[in-house]
Every structure is written in C-alpha cells, then in structure tokens.
From Swiss-Prot:
Zn(2+) 2 binds at D105, E140, H353. This is Succinyl-diaminopimelate desuccinylase. The lineage of its organism: Bacteria, Pseudomonadati, Pseudomonadota, Alphaproteobacteria, Rhodospirillales. PROSITE patterns: ARGE_DAPE_CPG2_2. It comes from Rhodospirillum centenum (strain ATCC 51521 / SW). Disulfide bonds: none annotated. The gene is dapE. The active site is at D74, E139.
Length: 386
C-alpha cells in the first residue's frame, strides 16, 4: 500500500531535526522506503571542524535510466517557540493546514515524493529503469557534509543519475506557480580598509580608513552589475554589515570592515566579480584586505525534456502553466547540476523559515499526484539501459 503523504509528513515534522541533528527523520524515511523495496545506504560525513551529518541514498532497480529525487530532512531552528500558535514540532492539522517546522521546507515535499513512488508502483509496477532518492541532513547548514559528499560517494560507487527533481518549495503563492530551472550564484565578500589609528584632534597624524571604505561601498553598490539575461534577473549587491569596533568618539580607527553579498547571474563568475571589486579598490586607493567566499555559481538547465515533463504534470493537475524561473536563493541543485539535468518543484514557500510554518493539506495531496505523473511520463519515454 502506498504511504499516506500526510501521515508521513507529520511523522517527519515531529522529528526535531535542526541541522545537524537528525532526530530520527532519516530512520523514518528509510523504514518507509525499504517497505517499498528500496535498497538504502546511510552515509554519515564529517569534515574537520564541522558537525557529523547523516545522509541517505536509496535506489529501487538496478538498471538505467535512473530518476532521482533530491531533498533534505534538516530544518532551521524554530526560533522563539512562544511566538508560535502551535508546537513547532507537533505536526498539527488545523483548518486544513499542516503546521510545523519543515512543513514547507521541505519535509512535506519528501513525504509527497515517497508517497508518489508508492502510488506509481501500485499503478504501474517496477519502473523501466531505477528510481532513487538523495536525502541529506545538511542543506540548511554549511552544506559541506551533505549532498556534495553523497554525490562524490555515488560517483565512486558507480551510481549514475540521469535526471533529478529537487523538491524545494518553489511556488511563491499557489501550487503550480513556478519551476526552478537554475539558480543565481552567491558570493560573500569581507572587505577591510586599513589605516592608522590616531586622535580626532590631530587627523593629520592618523590615516582614517573609513572615508575610503564608504567611497568603495558607494561605488560598488551604486553601479549595476548588469541588466539581466533572458533566463536571469539582474545581479544584485547587498551590503550586510559595517563594523569598526571603535566605541570611542575621539579615536580615529585603524580599520573598518564591511560585508556584502552578490547574487550573480550567468554573465559573471567568481573570478570576474573579484576582478571588478579589485578594480574599484584600486580606483579608491589605499590599503585593503579582501576575503571572498562562493557558495555556488550561476547555472541553468536549459528548457527541455525534464522541464517539459514536470511542467506538463503541473498543468495537468493544477490548471496552471508554471513559470520557468531562476529566482531565489541557492539550493543543493547547485551540486547536482554537474551530474545530470536538474529542476526544482515543490510546495508553496510563503511560510518557510517563519513562525507557524504551514502548508495546505490539499497541496500535499496534489503535489503527490504531480510527482506520480512526472514519474509515469518520464519512464514512459525512457529507454532501459543496463
């Protein structure tokens, strides 16, 4: 019998799996998948200086092509539990809505796909190939011991995936609004202007770095990086902090540090953005320290067979024609795109990470039906491969 997506989602929400804790969530997933005939591999990883994270790769079938669903069972903290009107980890249903941390992002999506697989098998029997799931416990955290590591393990084990659907909550307002076919890149910069400390009464004996820092930030923030591309919005630069560490009003500081984040489209690379930043610093002059961290580069899965199948399934069940979008933040699709075509579709994300996170029960059931139709249409056109 196919699993009930509502019951499974409630079970998963009741596991307080705040990154890096698993709290039994993957045990529940594994138990249900093994009941459907999947072979499951638990894959814990731990980079030095990080927390140990558990992951799961499950596969049904030993032939290609291999259709993979990717997702995560870790969640962000509930925050102030007193601000919630329900237990954040209670999985309560009130007025047709399922409440709890992870309901939207993305335990609901995980439950819907597992239930969809069960329904697919009941209606169609074994697939003409394989179905797999890659479920991590490190999507909401540093993302160093999760999907990326599982993909490395899969490559070493000869596990090939031919298409991947990531179940992130992609819809802004209503189920069927949007499919993600790519993501912008993300680069965070820590910029420090260097000077010489001194007394404010004798500024000529000091070197105040703050005017230079202010000028550089103005130049960086006021000049558009681009005007966008056919598939991407314009790149953006957002200033996130300025720190001088100087509580005294009569002291010129020796340094000032700012942090900013750039969300960039496919016109840029981390290297080209670094060159742009350094050009601005050279224009302003003075001494600087610059540290950059890239959490993902821009990528696009060109519209094709996979996005067509998902879009057709969405329209068949919701009556909506989904927008193919690259908006929003990063996701683990940024790791998967190097292995196979990947698109993202899941629940409505309006309440994700918020107090009283919730989804419509009707949406969970409809998402399950959409996922089943995706599997049916994908395997209908699949050529079996040994």
């Amino acid at each position: 019998m196919a699993p009930d997506p509502i019951a499974l989602a409630r079970d998963l929400i009741r596991c307080p799996s705040v990154t890096p804790a698993d709290a039994g969530a993957l045990d529940r997933v594994q138990s249900v998948l093994e009941g459907l005939g999947f072979t499951c591999h638990r894959l814990p990883f731990q980079e030095p200086g990080t927390e140990r994270v558990d992951n799961l790769y499950a596969r049904l079938g030993d032939k290609g092509p291999n259709f993979c669903f990717a997702g995560h069972t870790d969640v962000v903290p509930a925050g102030d539990a007193a601000a919630w009107t329900v237990d954040p980890f209670g999985g309560e249903i009130i007025d047709g809505r399922l409440y709890g941390r992870g309901a939207a992002d993305m335990k609901g999506g995980v439950a819907a796909f597992i239930a969809a697989v069960g329904s697919f098998l009941e209606r169609n029997g074994p697939p003409a190939g394989s179905i797999s799931l890659l479920i991590t416990g490190d999507e909401e955290g540093p993302a160093v011991n999760g999907t990326r590591k599982v993909l490395d393990w899969m490559a070493a084990a000869g596990e090939r995936i031919d298409a991947c659907l990531v179940g992130e909550p992609t819809n802004p307002r209503a189920l069927g609004d949007m499919i993600k076919v790519g993501r912008r890149g993300s680069l965070t910069a820590t910029l420090t202007a260097l000077g010489a400390q001194g007394h404010t009464a004798y500024p000529h004996l000091a070197d105040n770095p703050l005017p230079r820092l202010a000028e550089a930030l103005h130049l960086l923030a006021s000049s558009p990086l681009d005007m966008g591309t056919p598939h991407f919005q314009p790149s953006t630069l957002a200033l996130t902090s300025i720190d001088v560490g100087n509580p005294a009003s009569n002291v010129i500081p020796a340094r000032g540090t700012a942090r900013f984040n750039i969300r960039f489209n496919d016109l840029h690379t981390p290297e080209s953005l670094e060159a742009h930043i350094r050009d601005v610093l050279e224009e302003v002059g003075g001494a600087w320290e610059l540290a950059l961290q890239t959490s993902g580069v821009a990528f696009l899965t060109p519209p094709g067979a996979l996005s067509d199948i998902v879009a057709a399934a969405v329209e068949a069940h919701t009556g909506r024609t989904p927008e193919l979008s690259t908006s929003g933040g990063t996701s683990d699709a940024r790791f998967i795109k190097d292995h196979c075509p990947v698109v993202e579709f899941g629940l409505v994300g309006a309440s994700m990470h918020k107090v009283d996170e919730n989804v419509a029960v009707a949406d969970l059931l409809e998402l399950t039906a959409i996922y089943r139709t995706v599997l049916e249409r994908w395997f209908a056109g699949a050529e079996p491969r040994t």
